Amino acid sequence: MNTILIGIAGGTGSGKTTLTRHLKEHFGKDVTVIGHDSYYKRQVGRTYEERAKVNYDHPNAFDTDLLIRHLQELKAGRSIQCPVYSFVEHNRTDQTVEIQPAKVIIVEGILIFQNPTLRDMFDIKIFVETDADERILRRALRDVEERGRTLQSVVSQYLTTVKPMHEQYVEPSRKYADIVVLDMPLLDTRTKVGDLTGHLVSETVMEVLSFAASREHTTSERQAEGIR
């Protein structure tokens, strides 16, 4: 299977998941989506309070080696057992989800361009850039509503780990992107957010298709040269 591997990076709350969802809707059943968040390391022997204080925005928080091995398996046409992470418990669960190979594999996460080995696996690298104020608002809403966090804990985590790690690791990885998506203002009532989202996604889809076509053309040329 000639698999296209797409990486979508960007800061917390930048819109990575939204973009991923729209791309998946566009490409349909030929897409598999994997989140780097699923590969947070298991916190063995730590209490809930200790797990809550872990710096989850540092590269060492992730089992990226396992993700790399899983992507290699998928590209080779073999299914994987993807870990399941609980944001409520701050820990990996004992469950896994079977993921099948697909023509297009999308990997999303804040630090997927930070690791050179993982970064070099992507055929197309997309970075979603959004204003920091908008990102913290989105994160606060998400964590309070979906992950059982308090507003105080969200703000504390943002100031102590999220913001410093973004500046040290996430933002510098933007330079590796083939495509940079500038997200719309979250609270700008003067624009039609739905129209802007559709426009951004349409543009991104066209760029992805262009990169994919270019990649296939280059691969065909190399194969032809090998035959000669």
Segments (PLM) and residue ranges:
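Short hydrophobic/aromatic beta-strand immediately N-terminal to the Walker A/P-loop
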Residues: 5-7
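P-loop (Walker A) phosphate-binding loop of NTP-binding proteins
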Residues: 11
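Conserved lysine of the Walker
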Residues: 16
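Hydrophobic positions on the alpha1 helix immediately C-terminal to the Walker A/P-loop
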Residues: 19, 23
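Post-Walker A helix-loop "phosphate-sensing" segment adjacent to the P-loop in P-loop NTPases
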Residues: 25-34
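Conserved nucleotide-sensing/catalytic segment adjacent to the nucleotide-binding pocket
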Residues: 32-33, 41, 45-89
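NTP-dependent small-molecule kinase module
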Residues: 100-101, 163-228
